[in-house]
Amino acid sequence: MDYQHIKVERGGEIAIVTFNRPDKANALNHRHIEEIEHAALGFRDDETARVVVFTGAGKHFNSGADLTSDDPQHPLLMVRRQRRRIGQRCIQAILDMDQITIAAWKGAAMGGGACIATAMDFRIGARDCFMSYPEILIGVNLMWQSLPLCVHLVGPARAKQLVIGGKHVPGPTLLAWGALDEMVEADAVVEKAMEWARHYAAQPPVAAQMIKRSVNAISGALDRSVMHMDFDQHHLAADTSDAAEAVSAYLEKRPPTFTGN
């Protein structure tokens, strides 16, 4: 695949994947998500890379769905369901990577961007970083099988603050909650992530990979069984009048009026 929206740099034991739509705050369209999934799957056959650092070009890690995207909407629900599985596949591809994954996180990690960040093994954040799940603000649920990742990371009550509240949670709070492993100045975040990468790249790779898989299996044993319907819930919510009102209000920069329909 020829990448349009990401860059993949392979240089020995540490690789870097950069979300590369800085003019859109690295927002996600369908092609962008496909590229991230493809890159993650591509590391299955990489016998050299032991750690992969994910970061964003420009000021932001990843700002989530590009609501201005002109991605075509297929008239058949069956096809729309298939297309929307790309987000789940992308997150699962990241979770299944043998390599240790580290997010070098500046600015926003919103929606799908927050899902990607929570799928990483470690998160190094800049002081200006923040997380939010704005799906609730456009009348839909969080999908991509990522709700369990948020709950595992910050606990049930704080997950509800994030996912139901829809507010921006700043870096210092994320650090206190355990969503960040370390916080540094923005101009040092990539180098700090690389410092972590060098440490984990120096560990015995077979043992590191087995331990990672075991920890993920233990912590996420029920995740797929309880979240297999999240994209169908999304379709149900997305077809409501409230969801249409939320998107219109966002694009028109006005407060929404929700009716429960």
Question: Where do the PLM segments sit?
Answer:
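Terminal low-complexity tails and localization/encapsulation signals of metabolic enzymes
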Residues: 1-3, 248-261
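Well-ordered beta-strand positions
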Residues: 122, 161, 165-167, 173, ...
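Conserved CoA-thioester-binding segment of acyl-CoA-metabolizing enzymes
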Residues: 1-57, 92
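Glycine-rich beta-to-alpha active-site loop
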Residues: 90-138, 142, 168
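Hydrophobic, secondary-structure "cap" segments at the distal end of domains
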Residues: 147-157
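Glycine- (often His-adjacent) and acidic-residue-rich active-site loop
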Residues: 56-93, 109, 139, 222
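C-terminal long alpha-helix characteristic of the crotonase
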Residues: 22, 124-129, 180-228, 241, ...
